[in-house]
């Protein structure tokens, strides 16, 4: 278990400094249209094979079409892979961009493009932009990354106020708790390192607050730090144990399922942007075995339940859900029964937050090798997401060298989805 403000804010910020900067940033985003839209980005690190999930080619040669067959969904004319049966029942809630492309088949550079909307120069991640422009809604962190940090998920020149709150722990583990909530002021961190969990710590601080009745000598920034430790919103958001066993099983008792459940709790409690950084999708070998045994059953259950849960709670209209890897996989199967990296064409899935469900935008060619029409890229995706969140992409921000820069260069809002 790691305790400390540097861990909590992901990029070495001291807690009072981060909160002060966050308070200043929050004033820039009030009153914008879309201010109430949150984002859950399920990032499938390594690259989801969308030719085997959301854009199958049953008429292609065997070395392209692979082992899986398409199945019908609850939307006439839209099919998905046979190992996505639960998602097939919720196709009316999501839309598919089947002509998504950026041409970059390299780890790292493609990740950066998909998470920032910029190909080359270091730029802040989408979640950092949302945190910087809008600030926090309450004491719940506005931008959260789980269950592990990603190198391209940071704030870059926006500074520590826009850094993600990192949950560096697997929410599917027994006794899961959030390790990186730092205690304010002179509270001995050793008292928190005994693995009794976040909730016991919060309960103790709450009893102290009730006894003292006031914050005492805290300045306003340290009061906010104390608030993070004691607020009902934060306690509720991180308390997975309060969910019924039935609810937890509905999402799946695995990393992706419990991460999606925690993400729902976070946006319900006030977070603006939650990135789920999920690994093991780089299927260079045994693509079909890995997909049908673990990867797709987990994704199918977690994603379908997230969409159902958000919809039933009346949250889907105000929660944008995005699913993608940094790229797709090659149309042609390699000698190891795998598919390699493929940036020239893949499928991006979007739901909620103002996105109309049950639509397909664009199309790939007969092998899913390149867009057949209406190519759409990361800048368009970024422009659409920022539009839905009410982020002014013309806003000038300043690098550490005081150089003015727009939050996004180019890109169009994908009106076909709205």
State the predicted function of each range.
Residues 1-418:
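Ligand-binding pockets and gating/stacking loops
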